Design a protein with these regions (language model features):
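Extracytoplasmic gating/loop element in the C-terminal half of outer-membrane beta-barrel translocons
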Residues: 55-159
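Transmembrane beta-strands of outer-membrane beta-barrel pores
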Residues: 41-43, 52-56, 138, 145, ...
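Repeated loop/turn-to-beta-strand initiation elements of outer-membrane beta-barrel proteins
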Residues: 43-47, 148-149
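C-terminal beta-signal and terminal closure region of outer-membrane beta-barrel proteins
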Residues: 71, 89-92, 169-214
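Outer-envelope beta-barrel architecture signal
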Residues: 31-33, 42-44, 132, 154-158, ...
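Membrane-embedded beta-strand positions of outer-membrane beta-barrel proteins
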Residues: 48, 160-162, 210
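Membrane-embedded beta-strand positions in outer-membrane beta-barrel channels/transporters
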Residues: 34-36, 138-142, 207-209
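Acidic carboxylate motifs that coordinate Ca2+ or other divalent cations, activating on Asp/Glu
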Residues: 5, 9
């Protein structure tokens, strides 16, 4: 009861009458960074490019099925391993109300009609996700053969390399939203944009090649 009115409600959804609603989180990406690392030793080369965002909050859209799972629409039960509900879901037999992250399973709790009758339809601090991340955008390992080998092969230069694009991404987001890519998140401003998490993730690419100089 933030407004001390004795009733928990959203007021008139206006700036001057917002009831118990308050601003939570910040979905803007802050502290963007990039790091280039490179090293060479005895013909062996290694280069790594890291990129990421130091701070960003994200709240799942009301119809983000890959986050809410069965708490949204019941047919999401056909999609395996959305969540492991066994330990983090409230169970009256375990009486784990103080440690469970998820409430008791009931369908259509996240995608309500904005009338405050559903448990999960009102954004709250409990389910704000940490969408900061660091991604290995590019990593390359190469080996340049020495002059003796090149001379025997009548070459000016010979190098083997293996390159990986987007091979790894670390983000706290994947604790409860493993199917989401932090770079592909959108903003849930209305129900038209609420169905999040259905875009293809950034692809991983691996390339092996040979550079030959005659």
């Amino acid at each position: 009861d933030l407004d001390k009115s004795g009733v928990i409600d959203p007021g008139e959804f206006k700036v001057d009458d917002h009831g118990d609603l308050s601003i939570i989180g910040n979905q803007q990406a802050r502290y963007r960074f990039g790091i280039n690392l490179a090293a060479n030793w005895n013909g062996i080369g290694l280069s790594v490019f890291l990129q990421g965002v130091g701070k960003r909050d994200w709240y799942p859209g009301s119809d983000a099925g890959y986050f809410w799972g069965k708490y949204g629409r019941p047919f999401f039960s056909f999609i395996p391993a959305i969540h492991d509900y066994t330990d983090d879901m409230y169970d009256p037999e375990k009486n784990n109300w103080d440690t469970a992250y998820w409430p008791r399973i009931t369908s259509y709790q996240s995608n309500g009609t904005n009338n405050w009758t559903k448990v999960l339809e009102v954004p709250n601090t409990r389910y704000i996700q940490n969408a900061a991340y660091v991604r290995v955008k590019n990593i390359q390992v190469d080996y340049s053969f020495n002059r003796n080998v090149c001379d025997k092969l009548h070459l000016q230069g010979l190098k083997l390399y293996l390159t990986a694009e987007n091979p790894f991404c670390y983000t706290p987001l994947h604790k409860y939203a493993p199917n989401f890519d932090p770079e592909g998140l959108s903003y849930d401003t209305d129900f038209a944009s609420a169905a999040q998490g259905y875009t293809y993730p950034i692809l991983k690419t691996f390339t092996f090649g040979i550079n030959v100089t005659f």
